[in-house]
Amino acid sequence: RYSCPNVIDNNTMTKKFLHLGLLVFLISCAFACKNKGQLTEASKTDSTQENVAKPNIIYILADDLGYGDLSAYGQQKFTTPNIDKLARQGMLFTEHYSGSTVCAPSRSALLTGMHTGHTFVRGNKEIQPEGQYPIPDNTYTLAEAMKKAGYATGVFGKWGLGYPGSEGDPLNQGFDTFFGYNCQRLGHNYYPRHLWANTDSLVLEENAGTKKGIYAPQLIHEKTLDFIEFNKDNPFFLYVASIIPHAELAAPEEIMEKYRGKFPPEKAYKGVDDGPEYRNGPYESQKETHAAFVSMIHILDNQVGEIMAKLEQLGIADNTIVMFTSDNGPHTEGGADPDYFNSNGPFKGTKRDLYEGGIRVPLIVKWPGHVKPNTRTDHVSAFWDVFPTFAGIANMEVPPSLDGVSFLPTLLGEEKEQ
């Protein structure tokens, strides 16, 4: 502590200057505090504006949905009103291609931006007791790029790119949140004994034995809506990897009732309904495969509609880009009948076939204020083009390893630049 009693006590002028200096100092502090508060609020505003400027991105991936399985693409036996509405509000692609003819490599191409000649996962290599061969730790995924750009990242549905806890686990590949099937083999069954919530196995007691208490796509959908609600004030990347209408043909009875007897002649399918392999990969029996298939498409279409309604309810629809597509062509397993529904449209081949019917898939994109409503394009694009397209939308750096080419100019109506 320092003091100068003689100076302060003996010099009135000095005292006046000291008092004046103290007054100026206090006033300066007051203004500084006020300005600091204003700068803090301004920073918050700038941060909020920056987040608002970044569009939310939702990528909905159906599983084994054929080019002809939507009424917007020519389906005649049933309708998909919510997905059709999405097409009317956005752009419909007529020449979009999946990453591969089957699940895991198609997803790998999507998330790495590399075609199947370069991306690590090139087949459905199974790991026991659960999961598939993982993508390596040094893989730079779309989710990691999104996270680096300030996005909350979530995947809901089927993963298939690395068994639980592996380097390919979704939480090790850029996703903040995961809920659903880690193993695509177990995704053959719609009433599973467990699902994964991040790194925790969630046992579904309601599905123990032969019970059918929880229809997994519905539970996953509810968690998807929760993710949107939770992140409504921040930019998010949501990857909805639906298992519909993959493999087993199964739907809740209240939905099946709407379609029973409407698609004759019905075809019965005999599957595995008990024993050690029950709900461990093989499909259950289904007496009315046509009605079951349409019921599943009904559920998928409704879920798309509910996602769009949630965006509207939260007031974020205008700042959200939504893409809808499928991972490959229609399948023939579990009693599925693509010939009856003309699921592959005018094309030859189905899932696993390297023909147009096996790899040409729907793609619909809605982005209010950017993508002109009710438009079509014959621009040729594929799954590995999605990464650079999203990079352009979110102002992200694109790694040189990508094979894809952004189709953002096409979305913006700038075909000449494309």
Please place each PLM-identified region on the residue numbering.
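Bacterial Sec-dependent N-terminal signal peptides
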Residues: 1-52
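Active-site-proximal cap/lid insertion segments
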Residues: 39-43, 48-55, 62-78, 94, ...
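Active-site segment of extracytoplasmic enzymes that catalyze sulfate/phosphate-ester chemistry
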Residues: 59, 67-154, 164-165, 177, ...
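Basic phosphate/pyrophosphate-binding loop/patch that engages nucleotide-derived ligands
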Residues: 147-150, 414-418
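Conserved beta-strand scaffold positions in the cores of enzyme catalytic domains, especially
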Residues: 155, 178-180, 237
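Short, structured coil segments at secondary-structure junctions
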Residues: 171-174
